[in-house]
Amino acid sequence: MTNMRTMIPAGSSVLVWVTCLLLAFVTTVTGPKVIQPEVDTPLGRVRGRQVGVKDTDRMVNVFLGIPFAQAPVGPLRFSAPLPPQPWEGVRDASINPPMCLQDVEKMINSRFGLNEKIKIFPISEDCLTLNIYSPTEITAGDKRPVMVWIHGGSLLVGSSTSQDGSALAAYGDVVVVTVQYRLGIFGFLSTGDKHMPGNRGFLDVVAALRWVQGNIAPFGGDPNCVTIFGNSAGGMIVSSLFLSPISAGLFHRAISQSGIVTTIMMEDMKPWPEAQNFANSVACGSASPAELVQCLLQKEGKDLIKQKNVNISYIVNDSFFPQRPEKLLADQQFPTVPYLLGVTNHEFGWLLLKSLNILDKLEHLSREDLLEISRPFLAIMEVPPEIMPTVIDEYLDNGSDQSATRYAFQELLGDISFIIPTLNFSKYLRDAGCPVFLYEFQHTPSSFAKFKPAWVKADHASENSFVFGGPFLTDESSLLAFPEATEEEKQLSLTMMAQWSQFARTGNPNGKGLPPWPQLNQLEQYLEIGLESRTGVKLKKGRLQFWTETLPRKIQEWHREQRSRKVPEEL
């Protein structure tokens, strides 16, 4: 494989930096001085800090916690985001911002890293901020592509600072922006009307993208070359933005990593019943939406996040989703921008099972257990109880041992939650004329051996550390840092950073020295990403046929049989 460390060209954009200190490493009695870059934006001046990246001399300017909307506090708690207000003087953007209100214990239990580590920052309702990572080298007249990262976490947990964009910015020569959005009830609980509009978390991201359009140029970014990308719930948000009419023109490419809005894990909810259910749990029950919201506004935010068992998802029939996502897809109501998307080969390998508290049940899983645990997932897909054993038969042979039963369960959940939705989504886009690039990440990170069972392959979100250059992050306490990566894994990370940034730059992940990545066409080719990447054909062909043809036919036959039985009874 070609060494990617010298492949990516040096800086390519304009940026006028005002520094507080002119010399980066002038030693004094107090030690080396630190460069603190300052940038003038339309809203005010910000002061950041400068960081290095391993195995390269390139430096990155980092600006943390820049507000892209007014703080959603007080009467604005459940309102759509409002434009940010300008500030006087120089805003300190060198320290990590607070995370949006969330259940921190749940976040700790939902680790998306390779090393079972996570930084916990203070939580606050004043959290609509973004971080910017921009290479310091500049060439007059150029602007760098902008890559806007949307974090995952089931719309319940996560933060912008969990993903350090410095290595991707340095090696990819791009401006990386990581954004925060309101989580849980603060971002998605809705009365279904003006009193508490839904999809606020999505609207927060739209506000961030609008901020990027008007403010990213002073940081060296090109507002006409913006890529949105995200993993898990972040990938789902990317696909939602792609389908939403109100985000039109705010981005030019899209990347969804293991997350599509049409997944069964993110069904649209009935807003008013959910709002009433939650309000009753905090003594705010009311038949009046206005009174219900007023009561919730009086509650302490940290008390509201303690409540469990509330359904958090998107709603339809509003400005963000005027119709169901499936309808928007079928009617091709989306822009034909380049789209890169994919999955891992073991989506339910460990992480998601752990967060769902069903990991321990895998040790002695019988066929009956498999059916019972799968029932809620299949019910969401409207599979009749009488047909559910057919699904188990598809995944499990008679006489299978416990390891085969465990793998069948993991494969089943991975297919219905991520892989089949991703494959269906990619074909809709391909047929509409979008340039589509599909992948399956297949490498098992070497660090998994320290805390995951040997049977775990490429688990959910395991590609993140490679996309963000985990082996090259200087802050080894960072969630995605991967200091123990092998030389082969370092090379894989360099390759993936080059592919992702090349896609952001051109709309195509192919480039000199990179593994050939075919565009999705009628041959259904995709890239199998690993230490030795290669082209694959018709990912999960048999399973896709089962879910899109065989099972729907069996369900139709069952319904016809039920109707035919009712006719004699009525006579």
From Swiss-Prot:
Glycans are attached at residue 311. Its main location: endoplasmic reticulum. The lineage of its organism: Eukaryota, Metazoa, Chordata, Craniata, Vertebrata. A motif (Prevents secretion from ER) lies at residues 568-571. Involved in the detoxification of xenobiotics and in the activation of ester and amide prodrugs. The active site is at residues 232, 347, 460. Keywords: Disulfide bond, Endoplasmic reticulum, Glycoprotein, Hydrolase, Serine esterase, Signal. Residues 1-31 form the signal peptide. InterPro entries: AB_hydrolase_fold, CarbesteraseB, Carboxylesterase_B_AS, Carboxylesterase_B_CS, Type-B_Carboxylest/Lipase. It holds the Pfam family COesterase. The keyword Nucleus does not apply. This is Carboxylesterase 3B. GO terms for cellular component: endoplasmic reticulum lumen.
